[in-house]
């Protein structure tokens, strides 16, 4: 604790003192609102909205709004917010992080600020870590919101645009961080504003905020399309990588050459998780691929592939960093142990691992849009979050997001005992001690949860435990399908559960077991849902429908479906049947000491260790935790220092004798702090680079939004034409000596859209009568004539539509290429550091130069497309295509330039009649009567009279 905190208290302490009087106000209002009828209580919502309209602030109405929500929760859900939960709600409303321990009811806490802020009508986003929690909370808490007159939406995978739009239009919207982020990116790829789904970013409440804003911060959201076919170079380089000898060091010393530190062909730096070719490896590469110099510019692609291949072999470990399942390489989340379906390593690393594992190497992808969670969530006017473990990352939350942490007291005193670390000389000695402790707990009827850091280590421990008992469950990325069931029952008497990292599991471990899961297990056993869905042949019931019905058995959503109601009735019957036995068992487990948590290794982050400990001792229950460590653990070996090892040797301890030493524990915590600091710097560095892209992204998306908002951009298109012509004339007609002017290059540049082969065939005698400005004016006037002729032909509304389409398509295509170019720039920019230049500054300077070039390309491409496109077939207004398809689809290049064969001027226009309920030919997918084309052309769409 700092001197300032000792004198004045921490931010959290000061905030709690400020909040306590407000909490008392809310509690004092309980009798007032408890006396109201349901109708009178529900009438408070429109009354609050009116008060806001009359000039009151949210802070003014906070005590009353919280008191109303609290009373409504009691009437609708049978739950009433405790004083500490009101404290958490106030912290969230103020834009802070409420640090609340596991089991303290964070889901209910969020209803207070969500209800209050939803009264503004701007929308509240409640962000969860998975679809299950989003659905559960939206249904469960949705009953409360709807009773109070607010609408609730849910964003889930597989929903179409209309459903998403409706969900975002609701007062309160639940969804995962991924869904919110991807919807933002997709909204900035649409061609019509009506296709956007989000309506702004006013207020977000982020559940498990540390997981989303810290752990996920280095992983950008990427929408990608199909790129080039996967290069055969991956397999060639993989064959080469298999011939190399690996050398491993704890940490490479910067000032000592790689070759002096390693005798292999490449060296692996364990501490920093990097791989580097040695001189021997470089020679082998040059010989294998028959090249003279691997470092030459023409061999950059090959060198990059080799770097990724040796990283795949030297750093990336199967069943730790990834698993191979059904012929696919699937990333394992290092923080939660979950499989990350749909995620891929970037820069060719994923393909290198696929080649290493002998599975199909997937084709490369092209990035269409991207953003980091850091920059997405910083867009919200007000951001808040909840978690059980935020204090260790306080600096990052404050520096990056401007979020302060308020540690909310528990409702009941914590009874968990955290024992000192038990440290062993070897991993085997540690595992034997763990097994001994597990068996002792099991014998006493005490449930035990063993946390491991990888799939591989969980399976190693399971094999050792099998020699003594088979009565245990293993939860890792390979069998995550039973995750909720295993976690829910981990608190039963004598239960043994071995699991990879428990962060963000989302299901509370209840002592005595979980009644709901027992009820569902019985429903499965008796095939209740199958009999409902297919009474005559239960075995023929659709498995997907069975699972959906089972999920609804304990759902909270309103329904009139007879099957769902029957399933809920059966669920309630079983719930009531099992509850007494579970409560009795829970008392036995409490008497045995509650849940015992065993950590088998320290994580790089203290926060993940704290999350594991936090699974025990929920809501004042007893519990215990202890970490079993060894000198051979990665963290101890890489960061513990030699003094720990020498201490063990001095004490002459065998591998089965533990030591509880504060010095060793302090050394470990110091190492963890260093690692946390280093990882923070990495995330901060990622943000520095993404901030450059973010500034550019905001400019591009801002311009897109103006176009989508329906602004008339005809004047802007004319200015773009003028600027493009002036720029080209300055380039090709540079200087005052007309003999040096490159008329041929200017003619070729505009050939087919502004010039003909006959243009600019000047002789020296003509030079006195021409000027750069005159040529530019001639080209501009010619372009304007073409545009004016098109406007007469198609009509002003359709011409405005064409201008929008052309600009949006060119912006999107150039932006996609720019993302790739910036990515390539970033990959190579780090080398500037060797030249005493700041890579971030260099990236910013060159990035904005590239951005200016992109803007020039957008300008030229847009006016060129507008000048040359022609509607090709009857009724074909500009086709509303998906972004990233080949530009110009639905159009043929024409050209209205004088002397160039194209569509004749003055051609009669024919109108094609379209039925009101027919699909609009523009490709929007809407019926004619609902499409904007009907508003522009109520009589039908114009087309050439001579077209079929």
Language model: regions and residue ranges:
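Short, Lys/Glu-rich amphipathic helical modules
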Residues: 445-458, 709-710, 738, 764-768, ...
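Extended, charged helical/alpha-beta scaffold domains that provide interaction surfaces
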Residues: 33, 322-330, 336-344, 589-590, ...
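Glycine-centered loop/turn positions within well-structured domains
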Residues: 219, 448, 505, 815, ...
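Hydrophobic, well-ordered secondary-structure elements that form the walls
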Residues: 450, 498, 815, 851, ...
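Conserved P-loop NTPase motor core
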Residues: 1-630, 634-647, 652, 702, ...
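Short Cys/His-rich zinc-binding micro-motifs
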Residues: 910-929, 933, 940
């Amino acid at each position: 604790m700092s001197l300032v905190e000792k004198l004045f208290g921490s931010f959290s302490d000061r905030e709690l003192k400020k909040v306590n009087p407000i909490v008392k106000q809310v509690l004092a209002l309980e009798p007032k609102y408890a006396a109201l009828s349901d109708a009178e209580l529900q009438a408070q919502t429109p009354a609050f909205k009116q008060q806001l309209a009359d000039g009151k602030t949210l802070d003014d109405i906070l005590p009353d709004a919280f008191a109303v929500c609290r009373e409504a929760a009691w009437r609708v859900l049978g739950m009433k917010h405790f004083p500490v939960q009101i404290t958490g709600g106030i912290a969230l409303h103020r834009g802070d992080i409420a640090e609340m321990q596991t089991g303290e009811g964070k889901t209910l806490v969020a209803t207070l600020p969500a209800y209050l802020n939803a009264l503004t009508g701007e929308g509240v986003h409640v962000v969860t870590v998975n679809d299950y929690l989003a659905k559960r909370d939206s249904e469960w808490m949705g009953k409360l919101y709807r009773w109070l007159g607010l609408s609730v939406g849910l964003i889930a995978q597989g929903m179409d645009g209309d459903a998403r739009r409706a969900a975002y239009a609701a007062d309160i919207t639940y969804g995962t961080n991924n869904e919110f982020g991807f919807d933002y990116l997709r909204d900035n790829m649409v061609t019509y504003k009506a296709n956007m789904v989000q309506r702004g970013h006013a207020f977000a409440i982020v559940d498990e905020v540390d997981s989303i804003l810290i752990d996920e911060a280095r992983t950008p959201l990427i929408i990608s399309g199909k790129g080039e076919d996967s290069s055969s170079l991956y397999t060639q380089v993989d064959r080469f990588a298999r011939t190399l000898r690996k050398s491993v060091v704890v940490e490479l010393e910067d000032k000592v050459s790689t070759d002096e530190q390693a005798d292999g062909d490449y060296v692996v730096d364990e501490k920093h998780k990097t791989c580097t070719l040695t001189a021997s490896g470089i020679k082998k590469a040059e010989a294998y691929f028959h090249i003279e110099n691997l470092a030459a510019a023409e061999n950059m692609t090959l060198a990059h592939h080799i770097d990724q291949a040796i990283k795949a072999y030297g750093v990336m470990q199967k069943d730790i960093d990834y698993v191979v399942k059904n012929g696919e390489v699937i990333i394992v989340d290092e923080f939660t142990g979950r499989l990350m379906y749909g995620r891929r390593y970037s820069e060719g690393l994923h393909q290198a691992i696929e080649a290493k594992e002998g599975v199909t190497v997937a084709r490369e992808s092209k990035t269409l849009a991207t953003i980091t969670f850091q920059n997405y969530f910083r867009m919200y006017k007000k951001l808040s979050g909840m978690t059980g473990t935020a204090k260790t990352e306080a600096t990052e939350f404050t520096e990056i997001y401007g979020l302060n942490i308020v540690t909310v007291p528990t409702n009941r005193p914590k009874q968990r005992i955290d024992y000192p670390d038990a440290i062993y000389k070897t991993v085997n000695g540690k595992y034997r001690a763990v097994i001994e402790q597990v068996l002792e707990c099991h014998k006493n009827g005490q449930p035990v949860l063993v946390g491991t850091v990888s799939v591989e280590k969980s399976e190693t421990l399971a094999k050792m435990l099998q020699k003594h008992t088979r009565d245990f469950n293993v939860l890792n990325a390979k069998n995550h399908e039973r995750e909720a069931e295993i976690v829910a029952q981990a608190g039963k008497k004598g239960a043994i559960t071995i699991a990879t990292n428990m962060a963000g599991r989302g299901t509370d471990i209840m002592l005595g077991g979980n009644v709901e899961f027992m009820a569902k297990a019985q429903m499965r056993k008796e095939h209740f849902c199958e009999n409902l869905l297919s009474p005559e042949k239960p075995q023929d019931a659709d498995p997907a429908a069975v699972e959906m019905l089972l999920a609804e058995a304990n759902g909270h959503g309103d329904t009139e479906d007879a099957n769902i109601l029957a399933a809920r009735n059966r669920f309630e019957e079983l719930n009531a049947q099992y509850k007494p036995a579970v409560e009795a068992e829970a008392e036995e487990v409490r008497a045995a000491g509650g849940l015992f948590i065993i950590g088998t290794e320290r994580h790089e982050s203290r926060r993940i260790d704290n999350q594991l400990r936090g699974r025990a001792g929920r809501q004042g229950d007893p519990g215990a935790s202890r970490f079993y460590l060894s000198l051979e653990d990665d963290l101890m070996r890489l960061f513990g220092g030699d003094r720990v090892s020498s201490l063990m040797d001095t004490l002459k301890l065998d591998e089965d004798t533990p030591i509880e030493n504060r010095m060793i524990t302090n050394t470990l915590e110091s190492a963890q702090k260093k690692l946390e600091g280093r990882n923070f710097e990495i995330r901060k560095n990622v943000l520095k680079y993404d901030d450059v892209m973010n500034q550019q992204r905001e400019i591009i998306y801002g311009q897109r939004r103006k176009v989508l908002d329906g602004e008339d951009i005809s004047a802007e298109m004319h200015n773009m034409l003028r600027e493009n012509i002036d720029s080209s004339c300055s380039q090709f007609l540079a200087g005052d000596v007309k003999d040096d002017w490159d008329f041929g290059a200017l003619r070729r540049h505009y050939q087919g859209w502004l010039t003909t082969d006959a243009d600019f065939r000047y002789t020296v005698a003509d030079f006195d009568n021409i000027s750069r400005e005159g040529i530019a004016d001639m080209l501009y006037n010619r372009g304007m004539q073409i545009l004016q002729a098109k406007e007469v032909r198609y009509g002003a509304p359709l011409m405005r539509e064409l201008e929008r389409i052309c600009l949006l398509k060119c912006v999107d295509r150039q932006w996609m290429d720019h993302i790739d170019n910036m990515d390539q720039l970033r990959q190579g920019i780090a080398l500037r550091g060797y030249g005493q230049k700041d890579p971030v500054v260099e990236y910013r300077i060159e990035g904005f130069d590239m951005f200016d070039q992109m803007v020039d390309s957008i300008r030229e491409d847009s006016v060129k497309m507008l000048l040359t496109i022609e509607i090709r077939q009857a009724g074909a207004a500009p086709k509303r295509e998906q972004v990233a398809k080949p530009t110009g689809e639905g159009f043929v290049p024409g050209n209205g330039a004088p002397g160039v064969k194209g569509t004749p001027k003055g051609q009669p226009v024919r109108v094609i009649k379209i039925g009101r309920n027919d699909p609009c030919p523009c490709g929007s997918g809407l019926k004619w009567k609902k499409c904007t084309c009907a508003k522009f052309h109520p009589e039908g769409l114009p087309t050439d009279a001579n077209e079929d």
